[in-house]
Every structure is written in C-alpha cells, then in structure tokens.
C-alpha cells in the first residue's frame, strides 16, 4: 500500500559528476567539512551557502555542489571539481540520498509529526524496536543516534544534507530502523525531502509556531504533507484530535491504497484505549486493535501518554510485530529525557520536569498530576514562555497554568533577545493571583521546592531536557533537573 506523491521538487537530476566513495561525507556547513568531504552550497533563508565555498575548500572539500540560480558564477580560482544544481535548496536532501547510493532505502524509517509527543514516541519506538530485534536510531529534539548514546543537536529536524548524512552513517553502523521527529519547519523547509518514510504518526495539532506559520490552517497543512509521502505505507493518526480525525478521513478518500489507522480513546479509533487507570506509580490500559486485544501496564504517567503508547502499538503492529510482543516490550520502556521526568525523595515534594511549552501540553501535564495528587496536597506549576516566539501563546499558557495548578510561579524560559520581564508581563493578565513572579528561573525553582509541603507535587514546565538558558543570544548552562535536585537536597 502506498500514498500519493507529495509535490516536493523535481527529482530528476542531470548526470552527477560526483559519486560517493568510502569515507566521504556531504555537508552543507563548511565548518563540518573534513579532508575529502563534499560541500553542498545552498541558498538559505538568512545566509547563502555559496559564500562559504572558499572556507569549505580550505577545510578539505574535494567536490562542491552549488545552487545554480542563473546568477551565480563559479570562480575558476577555487580549482575543485564542482557542479551547479538548479533549485538546490529544495532538492539537497534528494541529491544527498542519491550521492550516498540511496542506502537509507534499506532502513525502516518511521516519521512522527504533531505539536506535542514527537520526542516521547520516537524514543519509545526505538527502545521497543530494539527489544523486538531491530537496531534502531533516533533523529530528534533530544539528540541523534542510537538509544542511550545520543549526540546533541540544535534542531528537531536537521538540515536536509545532515539528515541524509545521519541516515547514511547509521546504516553503515548497522542500523535497521530509524525513528525520526519531523517538525513543521522541517517539512516546510524541505529538510526531509528524499527520506524514504515507511510509516508516519500524527500526534495532535495545537497552537505553536504561529510566529512562523501565521495561522493554524497553514500549520496543519504543512503537517499533513508527511501523509501524502511517496512510498508511505502506514498513516497512524490520533483521532481524539479534531484535526487528526479530519486528516484521517481525508486520507482514506485521497489515498485508498494507504493503510490508515486511527488511535485514541474515541470509539472511532482502530487502536482504541479502554479500561484506563492511573496512579503515581504509572498507568494501565487495554488496547483494542485490528491485531487483537491486550493490556499494558507501564510507569509512564498520563492519558496523553496512553495515546502516545497507542501510536507505538499501531506502528509496530502495522510493521509486522505481534501484538503480545509489542505490549510486552512497551511495558519496559523508560520516559524520554525531560518528559514527565520525576525526581522522588522520601518525605519531600515530588518534582516533575517536563518539556511542556504549549498551552495544550501544559494543560495535559497538569491534569495528569492532578489525577495522582494526594488528598489535601497542592499542585505547583513553575513556568515561563520563550522569547522571540509567538506572543499570543503567552496568556494562553498563563490560563492553562491557572486552570490546572493550585499554585503558580511565573518565571523566565529562554528569553532570547527579549527582556524577560516583558515576556512575564504578557503572561500575567491571565494569572490573577500568582504565588510568585520571579525573573530568575533558578530562584523560582528553589522557592517552589522550599515552600511546597512534603506531599505536594511541583511541575517545572517548558525546558525539559534542555541544559541551557538562552539569554541575549548566549546559551548559559542551566538545567531544571539539576537545580531541582540541589534544592531538594538542601531542603533537609
């Protein structure tokens, strides 16, 4: 079963003057070039890669592909073999795949898109698939590589040449599968063009990145591109989500040969979650599927994580793994770093560090913790909003915090080039009676830990796995987890 071809870019290249040799890698960043590598010089949104051709040659590039827009002229003094390619910005991924010999075609590549849940699902898929006999790699927010040995990254979905270079390296290292986060920016900027997705998951569509996309309609349209991908066999859609339910119906009409599976609590779901129970120790749920019915108990927290588990069940079973085996291995998986990450100390408040940085994600994290909160205890929420991002999201985050938490501490979260107090001022109209307003995030975290009762729960939201605070263009070391652990230790 195959999906329609997404209109990406012209795929037919002229005869390439360069063929990959063992050890030669392609890069679009001249700083990554080593002796013998190939430089791909694309026009970018802010910079023109062709300006860095001399630097790439100095670093050892022995071949250059460059963006041929009809205006650029190759300088003969550069004196290395080269080839101009039209519309290279949109075709770089496909070019790199071809130069690498399309080795990623030998991988089971699974893409995950949606506003929230991408990191958890990709990391769980990798853990589960490894236990089922695959050798699985991850490309995503927390890092790239094999589970347990991820290399840090700066983008959820890397640049197109980097994506293909990663897949090539992983295949050379024996990988058989790859679980990949596919961001809306990645889809819109052609970063995944040339990736042979076999299966794709849609998690949800809630407000985020409107500073980039402008409208929710445009945001959703970009996300949906992944499900019209050439060669896609399985579309796995959260039908509890309004946009997801609409997308699933549309795909069934548009792509009759594509296997479309809806998942969620909805009666319309093909992979339906029933008999859901939750506690501070985790959750249990029954999954009714086209492959049978089974129960899974896990230490993961939250109804939204039950949905994420259902997505994993659907993808793994669609790829041929028996349901009983899938549920058995999913019961063993660990949370992704910074996703409902618990710090437990006897006689002290439970601290949960989570990446929730959208109103929907914050609402779900808080509702999950309210469900397991001890009688008479308070749920605290420490959060802020990122600078130089969608301002309209800020009061919505404040409203989600007030609605879901008993005590709210408003602070900073990567203010970037903005004044952090200005960001807080955008949040405060929705927070009528904050427990504290504190620009210094470390002070805010310590305050919550010091003031909370022993049976209270503290959610520190927004940064999750991040180990930095971005202030005025400088990333200073900062870890919510480290600050909270130290504060708990000092509490006595």
Residue ranges and their predicted role:
Residues 1-22, 32-38, 48-51, 257-259, ...:
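ATP-dependent carboxylate-amine ligase
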Residues 1-94, 98, 242, 269-274, ...:
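N-terminal leader/targeting and accessory segments in enzymes
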Residues 9, 90-239, 245-258, 310:
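Phosphate-binding loop of NTP-binding sites
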Residues 57-59, 75-77, 193-196, 226-231, ...:
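Short, conserved loop/helix-junction motifs that constitute active-site signature segments
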Residues 67-69, 182, 204, 239, ...:
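Short secondary-structure boundary segments
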Residues 71-73, 144-146, 186-188, 242-246, ...:
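Short, active-site-adjacent cap segments at secondary-structure transitions
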Residues 72-76, 173, 188, 197-351, ...:
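Acidic, Mg2+-coordinating active-site environments of NTP-dependent enzymes
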């Amino acid at each position: 079963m195959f999906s329609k071809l997404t209109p990406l870019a012209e795929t037919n290249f002229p005869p390439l003057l360069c063929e990959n040799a063992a050890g030669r890698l392609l890069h679009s960043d001249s700083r990554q070039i080593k002796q013998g590598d190939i430089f791909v010089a694309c026009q970018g949104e802010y910079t023109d890669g062709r300006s860095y051709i001399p630097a790439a040659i100095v670093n050892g590039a022995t071949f250059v592909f460059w963006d041929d827009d009809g205006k650029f002229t190759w300088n003969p003094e550069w004196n290395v073999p080269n080839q101009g390619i039209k519309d290279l910005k949109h075709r770089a991924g496909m070019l790199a795949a071809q130069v690498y010999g399309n080795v990623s075609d030998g991988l089971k590549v699974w893409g995950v898109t949606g506003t929230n849940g991408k990191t958890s699902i990709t990391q769980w898929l990798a853990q589960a698939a490894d236990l089922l006999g695959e050798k699985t790699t991850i490309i995503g927010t927390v890092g790239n590589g094999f589970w347990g040995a991820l290399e840090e990254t700066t983008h959820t979905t890397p640049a197109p040449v980097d994506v293909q270079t990663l897949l090539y390296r992983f295949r050379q290292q024996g990988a058989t599968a790859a679980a990949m986060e596919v961001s809306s920016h990645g889809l819109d900027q052609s970063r995944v063009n040339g990736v042979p997705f076999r299966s794709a998951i849609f998690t949800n569509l809630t407000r985020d990145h409107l500073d980039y996309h402008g409208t929710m309609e445009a945001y959703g349209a970009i996300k949906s591109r992944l499900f019209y991908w050439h060669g896609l066999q399985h579309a796995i859609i959260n039908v509890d989500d309004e946009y997801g339910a609409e997308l699933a119906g549309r795909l069934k009409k548009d792509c009759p040969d594509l296997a479309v599976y809806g998942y969620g609590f909805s009666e319309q779901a093909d992979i339906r979650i029933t008999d859901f129970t939750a506690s501070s120790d985790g959750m249990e749920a029954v999954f009714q599927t086209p492959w049978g019915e089974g129960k899974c108990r896990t230490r993961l927290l939250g109804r939204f994580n039950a949905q994420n588990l259902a997505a994993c069940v659907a993808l793994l079973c669609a790829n041929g793994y028996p349901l009983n085996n899938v549920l058995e291995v999913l019961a063993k998986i660990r949370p992704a770093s910074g996703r409902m990450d618990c710090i437990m100390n006897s006689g002290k408040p439970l601290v949960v560090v989570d990446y929730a940085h959208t109103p929907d994600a914050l609402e779900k994290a808080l509702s999950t913790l309210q469900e397991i909160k001890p009688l008479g205890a308070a749920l605290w929420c420490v959060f802020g909003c990122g600078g130089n991002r969608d301002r309209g999201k800020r009061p919505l985050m404040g409203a989600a915090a007030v609605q879901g938490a008993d005590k709210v501490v408003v602070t900073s979260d990567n203010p970037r080039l903005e004044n952090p107090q200005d960001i807080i001022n955008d949040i405060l109209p929705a927070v009528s009676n904050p427990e504290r307003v504190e620009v210094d995030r470390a002070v805010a975290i310590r305050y919550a830990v010091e003031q909370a009762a022993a049976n209270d729960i503290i959610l520190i939201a927004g940064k999750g796995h991040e180990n930095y605070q971005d202030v005025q263009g400088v990333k200073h070391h900062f870890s919510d987890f480290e600050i909270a652990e130290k504060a708990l230790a000092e509490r006595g």
